[in-house]
């Protein structure tokens, strides 16, 4: 079976899948709504992620065929991005369906589109980038790394694309994890219990895409999730600062990695600078995130 035949097979399967799915769903909407409203929030959270993945799998199948990806082989970056984008584009649609069922709203989840969110977004973005500038400046001064000056010329061509990706990824992840997930868990748990659980889920789900390099980052990712909860609280329950902060971190780190701007000297353990060149897997990155959280807690 060639690629065109496989693609046709997947498209036909998707049409059949959705026809059967919708025919089964239609008479059960009221029953489902009553069940969700009276269920523990853990069940609601599980239902959200299951529906999200089930809706995405047909798209993932098509993308896998188009990209000629074999499931027994590791994902390449050019294969990962289309899969990630297709998954993330579905999240607001799934949440819109939840809101349509009367189980919440985007405003409840912290997404209020007005002028103030742009100010908060800018504040968070600036804070995220500034924190990393301070961390890397300190590492330059201590001789832990140096700047690859010959690669600076690569920056102008990648700044905007990476910025748009960072804004998209940060926005979707904040809407899901500090928005829907945190708000839903708060219905049954105190805010800090909800924060701990949502941040743990946020950290562990990063293992889906890559395990070896992600595993050392799990504590840092959990702390990052907690700080982003603080950012939402500092913003009066809105997601603006958290979204900007998240996007700023992603944009700065991705720009450094893509352009190859930093080379580590090996003067200190990589557990200080970041295992596998990942700041969240090292003491410096963790202190950066922790310091940002302290600033948010006491000064914003």
Q: What does each of the following model-derived ranges do?
A:
Residues 206-214:
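Membrane-interface helix caps and helix-loop-helix hairpins in membrane proteins
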Residues 162-170, 190-207, 221-226:
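Small-polar-interrupted transmembrane alpha-helices in polytopic inner-membrane proteins
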